[in-house]
Curated annotation (Swiss-Prot):
GO terms for molecular function: ATP binding; ATP hydrolysis activity; transmembrane transporter activity. Pfam families: ABC_tran (PF00005), FtsX (PF02687), MacB_PCD (PF12704). The chain crosses the membrane at residues 271-291, 526-546, 570-590, 607-627. It is a multi-pass membrane protein. This is Macrolide export ATP-binding/permease protein MacB. ATP binds at G43, P44, S45, G46, S47, G48, K49, S50. SMART domains: AAA (SM00382). Residues 7-245 form the ABC transporter domain. It is found in: Cell inner membrane. Belongs to the ABC transporter superfamily. Macrolide exporter (TC 3.A.1.122) family. The gene is macB. It comes from the Bacteria. The lineage of its organism: Bacteria, Pseudomonadati, Pseudomonadota, Gammaproteobacteria, Pseudomonadales. Homodimer. Part of the tripartite efflux system MacAB-TolC, which is composed of an inner membrane transporter, MacB, a periplasmic membrane fusion protein, MacA, and an outer membrane component, TolC. The complex forms a large protein conduit and can translocate molecules across both the inner and outer membranes. Interacts with MacA. CDD domains: ABC_MJ0796_LolCDE_FtsE (cd03255).
Length: 644
């Protein structure tokens, strides 16, 4: 069986442009190259030799004709299959070396093996062995800028051999070197040819071309001279598949390393990109904490009145006039409500402002004439002394229980228990002090108050019996709506008309909580705009990065990177920026929230807003990083390599 050519071209043409503007660069090229040959393709600038090499190296596609590699029709291969072919069978040695400046010599050599899925230990050892064999054993950790031109070209040759290098394309490999380095590179290529590698050398220098056993000359896109093929006698090296255990996890690990290296290479730009994400995340966390703190503060204030309470007030829903001028609630109403099953306590309240006097001190406070069951109904305990009793209420006793603010105002340096104070020219004995309650939902001081028996207050202070409101404590909060309906029916039966209103504190708390939640999320939405702006910043920077690194993308594609590998690399950079920015934003958001809280603003931090803000930052990075990453993945290898 006769040997099969490694490369077979039939009537290959390549034109740039379309229609009448099309410019032919290659015209009907027919060519066979056998395994193990050392071929020099010569021609002046503009002859089409570099275009031919790009087609042979699967960096470009012919406009017409057929290209077979090792018997396989290359035109039938998709982008990823072409990438695998470049990775496993080809090696490129470029005139400008095309080494990645941010990577060491060994890391540059390892690139093809990374995309082949070779195990890290295996590829480290192989790269070191290749570089040592090329006289660079002491330059493994040097970056391209620290190497001479000849040394950089040897690194390029080692990279071409990393996956076996069955076919090596050398495009003007001596064009940027001095004579000594040029001779060294030519010697290396000759040695590789003797070892069985197929070498295709692109040059315009006849002296360089003489080292090849076969010379092909191209002029004006046509093959004008071919010294003839020579059947190989050397053993043909197979593509090196050792150590290739392709792993998705390994792909992500390498993409992460590359992303860290890329971001570190331009710290200032990375910091500016991070800033948008940091501000966005910190703003969301801070605004939501402030909004939730305000909501919780209002709800807590209302809850201090008791969430199991129903407030019955005089005046119908449509009745005009102030509540204080309406006299529709009377003592018999609260007694009737007390008889309803499920009512823990119904207490009357008759309130109004009065001036108190003790010794030479005057103080204005609210007087609340109420029932002895007030502490139970309002869940407001006495901390000193005792509350007045049913007997005190029945006997019209002149006793008083003070709120904390009132007690501190009238008795700053002594205990008020047993002392007497004057209210509306009536002398009351202080028998107790209430626990501190704090501000009401309206911001009023609930502790600036004096409690007296309802009977005493209505007769001796206010001179009236009608009530300002009835507070109803419900035994089972799940029956609030049911008890509210029973109270409504009872009062309707007694009054005949709806000259009262009932307020359900549980419903009020729920309504206010929902309203505050809406405001909280509104604040969060406003803050999220900055997060959106940060995401757009990520996209802008990534687009700039793709433009700046177009040549790097071309180098990676030439060494075997698939579209997925490029997409993965730039997506990883985007989400890494977003993740780092998100974490910093969370820390700053927590710190800012605590500082604001220390200044007296109510705040409430929970894990959900932090997780939400970080998750949004992460998702924003992926979303806005996808377009630049996709653009990078779909670049044409030959155009990317030609980019400056």
């Amino acid at each position: 069986m006769s040997p099969r050519p490694l490369i077979e071209l039939q009537d290959i043409t390549r034109s740039f442009g379309e229609g009448e503007l099309a410019v032919p660069v290659l015209k009907g090229i027919d060519l066979k190259i056998w395994p193990g040959e050392f071929v020099a393709i010569m021609g002046p600038s503009g002859s089409g030799k570099s275009t031919l090499m790009n087609i042979l190296g699967c960096l470009d596609q012919p406009s017409a004709g057929q290209y077979r590699f090792n018997g396989r029709d290359v035109s039938a291969l998709d982008r990823d299959e072409l990438a695998r072919l470049r990775r496993d069978a080809f090696g490129f040695v470029f005139q400008s070396y095309n080494l990645l400046p941010g990577m060491t010599a060994r890391e540059n050599v390892e690139i093809p093996a990374i995309y082949a899925g070779m195990a890290p230990a295996e590829r480290h050892a192989r790269a070191e062995r290749l570089l040592t064999g090329l006289g660079l054993g002491e330059r493994l950790s040097h970056r391209p800028a620290q190497l001479s031109g000849g040394q950089q070209q040897r690194v390029s040759i080692a990279r071409a051999l990393m996956n076996g290098g069955q076919l090596i394309f050398a495009d003007e490999p001596t064009g940027a070197l001095d004579s000594k380095s040029s001779q060294e590179v030519i010697r290396l290529l000759t040695d590789l040819s003797r070892q069985g590698h197929t070498i295709i050398l692109i040059t315009h220098d006849p002296d360089v071309a003489k080292v090849a056993r076969r010379q092909i000359r191209i002029a004006d896109g046509e093959l004008v001279e071919d010294t003839g093929a020579e059947m190989p006698s050397a053993q043909i090296p197979e593509t090196d598949q050792n150590g290739r255990r392709h792993s998705r996890l390994g792909d992500w690990q390498e993409a992460l390393k590359s992303a860290v290296r890329s971001l570190h290479s331009n710290l200032f730009r990375t910091a500016l990109t991070l800033l948008g994400i940091v501000i966005g995340v910190a703003s969301v966390i801070t605004m939501l904490a402030i909004g939730e703190g305000a909501r919780k503060d209002v709800v807590d204030r209302i809850s201090t009145m008791g969430s199991d309470l129903l407030l019955v007030r005089p005046g119908g829903p449509d009745q005009r006039g102030g509540r204080w001028s309406v006299t529709t609630l009377v003592p018999s109403d609260f007694k009737a409500i007390n008889e309803i099953e499920g009512v823990l306590a119904a207490i009357p309240e008759l309130t109004g402002g009065q001036t108190l006097r003790y010794s030479n001190r005057d103080h204005s406070a609210e007087i609340n004439a109420t029932s002895f069951r007030f502490p139970v109904a309002r869940q407001w305990p006495v901390v000193e002394g005792t509350f007045f009793s049913a007997q005190d209420e029945a006997s019209y006793a002149a006793v008083a229980v003070l709120g904390k603010t009132t007690a501190n105002a009238l008795f700053p340096d002594e205990s008020p228990l047993g002392k007497h104070l004057m209210v509306n020219n009536v002398l009351f004995q202080v028998i107790g002090v209430m626990d501190e309650k704090g501000a009401s939902p309206m911001g009023q001081d609930q502790d600036d108050v004096v409690f007296v028996p309802y009977t005493t207050g209505s007769l001796r202070i206010f001179g009236q019996t009608h009530l300002r409101n009835i507070t109803v404590a419900v035994a089972d909060i799940d029956r609030m709506d049911e008890i509210e309906a029973l109270i409504h029916d009872t009062l309707m039966a007694r009054h005949g008309i709806e000259d009262f209103t009932i307020r359900n504190m549980a419903s009020l708390i729920e309504t206010i909580s929902e309203t505050q939640n809406t405001l909280t999320w509104l604040l969060g939405s406003i803050a999220a705009i900055s997060l959106l702006v940060g995401g757009i910043g990520v996209m802008n920077i990534m687009l700039v990065s793709v433009t700046e690194r177009t040549r790097e993308i071309g180098i990676r594609m030439a060494t075997g990177a698939r579209a997925w590998n490029i997409l993965q690399q730039f997506l990883t950079e985007a989400w890494l920026v977003s993740a780092i920015g998100g974490l910093i934003g969370v820390v700053i958001g927590i710190a800012a929230t605590r500082i604001i809280g220390s200044l007296g603003t109510p705040i409430h931090m929970t894990l959900l807003p932090m997780a939400l803000a970080f998750g949004c930052a992460f998702a924003t990075g992926l979303l806005f990083g996808f377009l630049p990453a996709r653009k990078a993945a779909h670049l044409d290898p030959v155009h990317a390599l030609a980019s400056e």
